[in-house]
């Protein structure tokens, strides 16, 4: 335990909280251009072909971003919006692409949880 005198000379340091999404630099989303669109396999025990794209952001960072939902229209040079949120079974993928904005189309025939996938309300 520190004495009062020691605390007067050198106060206690407060802990600095580390961000999970460094490339966003405190912003809710960031815009970027796809440099590569590809599929990758998840960690054990899962098995799939997860859709991922490499994105060069407007602030100069280059990050991997997961493309959620069934089917997508992204290719190289597509302009996308990314948000934070990692994919637990894909190492190094710490961002999600936002569906239904910029060049990313929403998911077709989506009936539930539509706002997450940029789908309009069905007639």
Swiss-Prot record:
Single GO term (MF):
tRNA binding
Q: Where is the signal peptide?
A: none
Q: Where is this region: Disordered?
A: 1-22, 103-123
What's the protein called, per UniProt? Small ribosomal subunit protein uS12
What spans are recorded as compositionally biased (Basic residues)? 111-123
Q: Which residues carry this modification: 3-methylthioaspartic acid?
A: 89
Instruction: Give the similarity note.
Output: Belongs to the universal ribosomal protein uS12 family.
Q: Name one Pfam family in it.
A: Ribosom_S12_S23
Q: Which NCBIfam families match?
A: rpsL_bact (TIGR00981)
Which BP terms does GO give this entry?
Answer: translation
PANTHER family named among the record's database cross-references: 30S RIBOSOMAL PROTEIN S12 FAMILY MEMBER
How would you summarize the oligomeric state and partners of this protein?
Part of the 30S ribosomal subunit. Contacts proteins S8 and S17. May interact with IF1 in the 30S initiation complex.
Summary of the function given for this chain in its UniProt record: With S4 and S5 plays an important role in translational accuracy.
What keywords are annotated for this sequence in UniProt? Methylation, Ribonucleoprotein, Ribosomal protein, RNA-binding, rRNA-binding, tRNA-binding
| Gene Ontology CC terms | small ribosomal subunit
């Amino acid at each position: 335990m520190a004495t009062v005198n020691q605390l007067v000379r050198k106060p206690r340091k407060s802990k600095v909280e580390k961000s999970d999404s460094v490339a966003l630099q405190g912003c809710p989303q960031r815009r970027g251009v796809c440099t590569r669109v590809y599929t990758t396999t998840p960690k054990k025990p899962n098995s799939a072909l997860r859709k991922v794209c490499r994105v060069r952001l407007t602030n100069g960072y280059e990050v991997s971003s997961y493309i959620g939902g069934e089917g997508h229209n992204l290719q190289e040079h597509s302009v996308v919006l990314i948000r934070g949120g990692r994919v637990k079974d894909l190492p190094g993928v710490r961002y999600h692409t936002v569906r239904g904005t910029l060049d990313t189309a929403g998911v077709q025939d989506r009936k539930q949880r539509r706002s997450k996938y940029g789908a309009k309300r069905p007639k």
